[in-house]
Amino acid sequence: EYTLPSDGMIIRQMEKKGKVNRRTWFALALMLLVVPLLLYLSVRFFHGRKYLICSLIVIVAAMLPFFMMFEGRKPKAREIMVISVLAAIGVAGRAAFFMVPSFKPVAAIVILTGVSFGGEAGFLVGCLIMMLSNMFMGQGPWTPWQMFSFGIIGFLAGILYQKGILKARKRDLCIYGFLSVVLIYGGIMNPAALFMSVYQ
């Protein structure tokens, strides 16, 4: 499943390049139907006050497709370790640059995780980075929305790479990073701010 080339990078050998399997479709349905519904119910009925419970439920929903990745094969320790380290680097990077406005090295790590390990891992790492880093930056009703936004960025990066649309080139990844942060993160967080202000 993994090879270690001379440059030391772990390269994921995609199962079937260009073909999205049933597990990925299940993950997509879970992430685009269940998680947004959960976020809406949290804002509508709890007025954003139960954000920690909602965040934990989003993490559990993100872990289900991730665990399904290992169905039928034995995961290697280095695979899980690298994913854990990527999440830790994202948390540390966000905390280190907290003084710099609108600059946090989160999207790059989430995108690289999605491209290298698949969309499910990208979604999980995006969720974990936002939830754990908000322990330092400040938790609030925005936390589940941030988790969902960066999770979708990582998941979509994995899908586009698997389909051959997104190439593992610096220019392509930078363009995707810019567009995904502006359109996906901004497109989710801006309406979320409106919902949170209306229902509080």
Question: Residue spans of the language-model regions?
Answer:
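Hydrophobic alpha-helical transmembrane segments
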Residues: 80-85, 108, 123-127, 144-148, ...
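Generic transmembrane alpha-helix motif of multi-pass integral membrane proteins
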Residues: 65-68, 106-122, 156, 160
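Membrane-embedded alpha-helical hairpins and interfacial helices in multi-pass inner-membrane proteins
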Residues: 15-56, 143-144, 163-200
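N-terminal amphipathic/basic-hydrophobic helices that include classical n-h-c signal peptides
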Residues: 1-13
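Lipid-exposed faces of alpha-helical membrane segments in multi-pass integral membrane proteins
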Residues: 30, 34, 60, 85, ...
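Membrane-helix interface segments
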Residues: 76-79, 119-124, 166-172
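Hydrophobic transmembrane alpha-helices
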Residues: 15-111
